[in-house]
Amino acid sequence: MLEQMGKAAKAASWQLAVLTSAQKDSALQVIADSLEANSQSILDANAQDMAEARRNGLVDALLDRLLLNPARLSAIAADVRQVCRLTDPVGQVIDGQRLDSGLSLERRRVPLGVVGVIYEARPNVTVDVAALCLKTGNAVILRGGKETYRTNAATVKVIQQALTDCGLPACAVQAIEDPDRALVNALLRLDRYVDMLIPRGGAGLHKLCREQSTIPVITGGIGVCHIYVDDTIDFEQALPVIENAKIQRPSACNSLETLLVHQAIAERFLPRLSHHMHTLGVTLHADDNARPYLADGPATCVAVTEADYHDEWLSRDLNVKLMDGFEQAVAHIRHYGTQHSDAILTRSIQAADRFVREVDSSVVYVNASTRFTDGGQFGLGAEVAVSTQKLHARGPMGLEALTTYKWIGYGDNLSRP
């Protein structure tokens, strides 16, 4: 089955690679309209997935990721239209020069070819990735989690019909509908047809892909994100940023998981933090040094464990740890962080500059929420993933991250000297 999917995707990628920007944008517009016109079939499939997920005891954070409703589906269609408005990077000349030999040489952006994406209970990823791949002339093979297989199947059916209506190959977007995990291993070895693989899931999935894949892999999306509050910050300015980072969408990979606080402000700041987090229903997981300042506050406070520092909460839980100073905060982030998104809240220019230089994360913020790590917020449109590695892309992966380049040389019957 996967062999045939791979062959079909590769053939489709050759057709997509030569489409004009106008042709691709027209197809994306039809896809967006079709998603809205066929929303009920997608929502019905999602309702079945949600019911089964609840029966299987899926945790609230994952249920939130799985859920589609009319508003979320409309937002997904709007994201596709936003991709239409983005500049098509395919065909752009990155740089060029005329050499002494007389050869005119340039680097030009081209599609990758076929992209494979493995993800979990995120039905929006199906559309986001399909739109970005089509915009950049790539075919895509999707393998969503077993929790979303009905939703994904219904969504891909709508997309494929839209492609057919536009005279484009339906197999440009394919989904592995069988939830059998053995098919993941088979996909990892489909290097004859798939040019890049992106796993969007937990540490176990990333480890499996790194160890077993014969396809180049880009990993990311695991976000143990930190905010360090230093001793110069204005409390009234800091608390709303912390709230936004933790509460806006706790199940997101760019939400705050660990708050590091300079010990010099603990006595004044932590009681206020407790009151603020209590109103938001946040449970604080504090170290031995921080707990005495939180014990009398209204927010639920428990002892943090070593494992807590390594894991994503993806819920209304927040680790709180006191720091001796800047160096200890950076050391903590280096040890426990996942190189996703980390921030400092400070009024010190020197501290801000050091944090930017010394914290080796994909995205580093000064006086801003970690929630900004998002393709839409960065002006990239929808994102295919947030890469936490350094090759071939880093941070939110928009259109350019789904391209490579080729060297093109022009001569006049030129021979090498």
Curated annotation (Swiss-Prot):
Keywords: Amino-acid biosynthesis, Cytoplasm, NADP, Oxidoreductase, Proline biosynthesis. Its EC number is 1.2.1.41. It is found in: Cytoplasm. It comes from the Bacteria. Disulfide bonds: none annotated. It catalyses: L-glutamate 5-semialdehyde + phosphate + NADP(+) = L-glutamyl 5-phosphate + NADPH + H(+). GO terms for molecular function: glutamate-5-semialdehyde dehydrogenase activity; NADP binding. Pathway: Amino-acid biosynthesis; L-proline biosynthesis; L-glutamate 5-semialdehyde from L-glutamate: step 2/2. Its main location: cytoplasm. Pfam families: Aldedh (PF00171). GO terms for cellular component: cytoplasm. One of its GO terms (biological process) is L-proline biosynthetic process. It is an enzyme of class 1 (oxidoreductase). Belongs to the gamma-glutamyl phosphate reductase family. HAMAP family: ProA. PANTHER family: DELTA-1-PYRROLINE-5-CARBOXYLATE SYNTHASE, GLUTAMATE SEMIALDEHYDE DEHYDROGENASE. Catalyzes the NADPH-dependent reduction of L-glutamate 5-phosphate into L-glutamate 5-semialdehyde and phosphate. The product spontaneously undergoes cyclization to form 1-pyrroline-5-carboxylate. This is Gamma-glutamyl phosphate reductase. The lineage of its organism: Bacteria, Pseudomonadati, Pseudomonadota, Gammaproteobacteria, Enterobacterales.
